[in-house]
Amino acid sequence: MAAIKKVVLAYSGGLDTSVILKWLGDNYHCEVVTFTADIGQGEEVEPAREKALKLGIKSENIFIEDLREEFIKDFVFPMFRANTIYEGEYLLGTSIARPLIAKRLVEIAKSVGADAIAHGATGKGNDQVRFELGAYALNPDIKVIAPWREWDLNSREKLLAYAESAGIAIEKKQNKSPYSMDANLLHISYEGQILEDPNVEPEEDMWRWSVSPLNAPDKPESISIEFQNGDGVAINGEKLSPANFWVNLNELGGKHGIGRLDLVENRYVGMKSRGCYETPGGTIYLKAHRAIESLCLDREEAHLKDSIMPKYAELIYNGYWFSPEREALQALIDKTQQKVSGVVRLKLYKGNVIVIGRESKNSLFNAAYSTFEEDSVYNQKDAAGFIKLNALRFIIAGKANRDK
C-alpha cells in the first residue's frame, strides 16, 4: 500500500476514537481530518471539536454535521417502507445508520483530498463490514484503516495507558453506563457486561429511553399518524419534519413502555451476539405502517413485499445498502408505496401498540363486497367454480394415489 498522506476519521470524541486519532499520526505519519455526525445520539457533538483541537487537529480539518433530517428522510423512512425486521425482531437501528456515515466519510475525503478513511469498529463486529462495504461501493479506490484490526491495544488497560502517554484527557463521567451503547434517532442499543450471558435478565436501570411497562400510565393514550406515499408526515394532525416526527414518536413510545427488545442475533461475521434495544418510535411506526398498507395495497402486492422483506433486511444488516440488489428491491418497494396514504389511529398502553382505526382515500376495502349482510354485487355461487379449479390438482393427485 502506498503511503497514506491524509485520512478522514469517524470521530466521536470518546476514548477509543481519540486514541485512534493519535495512533494514526504515530503510525501512519499522516494528516488527520475528523468527522463527527449528529444522527440523534442524544449527546452534544460540539465537545468533539474541542477535543480534536486539543489533540492537534487544525480547525479547518474538523467536520461536525447535523445529519438527523437526512438520516430519517433518506435511510429510516425508505427502510420502513418495506416493514423491515431482521430475524423476526430487530428493527435495524444500528445497521441503518452506518451507510450515511460511510457516505459522508467518502464525500469529505474527496473534498479535502484525503486518500483514506478510518473508523473505530472492532474486528469482531458487523460495523467494520458496513462501513467498509459502503465506502468501497462509493469509491473503489479509497483506502480504509481499521486500527482495531492492526494494533495491539486489545484491552481497556492498554488503551488507557496509551491515552495517558499521548496526553489524552480521560474523563470520568458520573452515572456512566457499564454497557457498550450506541444511539441514534431510531434506537439505543446495549451490549456487554452481564448481557454477555444470554440467560441473565438486564437490570431495570439499564433502560434509558422508556419506562417499564409496569410503571407506564394506567390510562391508554390515543394518537394518530398520517402517511403520504408510505412515509409518516404528521402525528395527531401536526405536520412535522422527518427528524421531529421521530423525536415525538420516541417520546410517546417511551412514556408508555413501548419498544424494549432483548434478543440473540446472528452477526454477519459468524458469531451470535446478545443485545438489548429500545426502539419506541419505530415499534409504533411499524404497526401503523402495516395498518395503512392493509387498506391501500393489493393482496399480491402486499404478499410480494412480505416475501422479499427478509432478504432486504439481511442486505441492510450485512452492510449492502449501496448494493445494486438493495437498490433494485428499493425500487420495487417504493413503487408499492405510491398510494399508501391515509391516517391510522392507535392506542398506546403499557408496552402495547393497538390499532383502533385506519382510513385512506386510496382504500381498497369495499364494504359492498365484504359485508356479512345481504349484498347485490357478489354472487356467492361463483365461489364454487373458483374452488373447484383450485382443487383440481388435489383431485387428480387423490385419484392417482387411490388407484395405486
Swiss-Prot record:
Entry keyword Ligase: yes
GO biological process: argininosuccinate metabolic process; L-arginine biosynthetic process; urea cycle
Molecular function terms, GO-annotated: argininosuccinate synthase activity; ATP binding
Involved pathway(s): Amino-acid biosynthesis; L-arginine biosynthesis; L-arginine from L-ornithine and carbamoyl phosphate: step 2/3
Example of a GO cellular component annotation carried by this entry: cytoplasm
Main location as per UniProt: cytoplasm
Catalytic activity, as annotated: L-citrulline + L-aspartate + ATP = 2-(N(omega)-L-arginino)succinate + AMP + diphosphate + H(+)
Oligomer and partners: Homotetramer.
Family named by the database record: Belongs to the argininosuccinate synthase family. Type 1 subfamily.
Protein name in the entry: Argininosuccinate synthase
Species assigned in the record: Helicobacter hepaticus (strain ATCC 51449 / 3B1)
Lineage, top ranks: Bacteria, Pseudomonadati, Campylobacterota, Epsilonproteobacteria, Campylobacterales
